[in-house]
């Protein structure tokens, strides 16, 4: 079992006032570091997401027209596949 440090209350495992006082000078700097770290990470993720959404590799490729016979055949194949998957 873990032994409590001298800076922890032995019954509740909470920080003692001495530990709280020792951490006070570093709180603002640590908080600013956290904000900067989260800001940079969030900015990178946002930038990457926006750049990837602009990607339109196939935007210039024309979609060929499909006639009604082919469309009906594709619908039948789709329905048969859907039924086959539902039976599994």
From Swiss-Prot:
Q: Which Gene Ontology terms describe the biological processes this protein takes part in?
A: mitochondrial cytochrome c oxidase assembly
Assembly and interaction partners: Component of 250-400 kDa complexes called cytochrome oxidase assembly intermediates or COA complexes.
Annotated Gene Ontology cellular component terms: mitochondrial inner membrane
Record organism: Kluyveromyces lactis (strain ATCC 8585 / CBS 2359 / DSM 70799 / NBRC 1267 / NRRL Y-1140 / WM37)
* Cysteine disulfide partners in this protein: none
Give the protein's biological function: Required for assembly of cytochrome c oxidase (complex IV).
Localization terms from the record: Mitochondrion inner membrane
Lineage top rank: taxon:
Eukaryota
Q: What is this protein called?
A: Cytochrome c oxidase assembly factor 3, mitochondrial
Q: Which residues lie on this side of the membrane: Mitochondrial intermembrane?
A: 50-88
Q: Does the keyword Transmembrane helix apply?
A: yes
Its keywords, alphabetically, are: Membrane, Mitochondrion, Mitochondrion inner membrane, Transmembrane, Transmembrane helix
**Transmembrane stretches, by residue range?**
31-49
Q: What is its main location?
A: mitochondrion
Entry membrane topology: Single-pass membrane protein
UniProt lists the family membership as follows: Belongs to the COA3 family.
Keyword Cytoplasm belongs to the record: no
Topological domain, Mitochondrial matrix: which ranges?
Answer: 1-30
């Amino acid at each position: 079992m873990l032994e409590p440090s001298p800076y922890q209350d032995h019954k509740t495992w909470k920080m003692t006032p001495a530990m709280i006082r020792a951490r006070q000078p570093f709180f603002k700097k640590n908080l600013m570091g956290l904000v900067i770290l989260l800001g940079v990470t969030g900015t990178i993720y946002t930038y990457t997401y926006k750049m990837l959404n602009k990607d339109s590799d196939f935007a210039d490729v024309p979609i060929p027209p499909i006639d009604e016979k082919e469309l009906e055949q594709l619908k039948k194949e789709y329905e048969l596949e859907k039924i086959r998957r539902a039976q599994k």
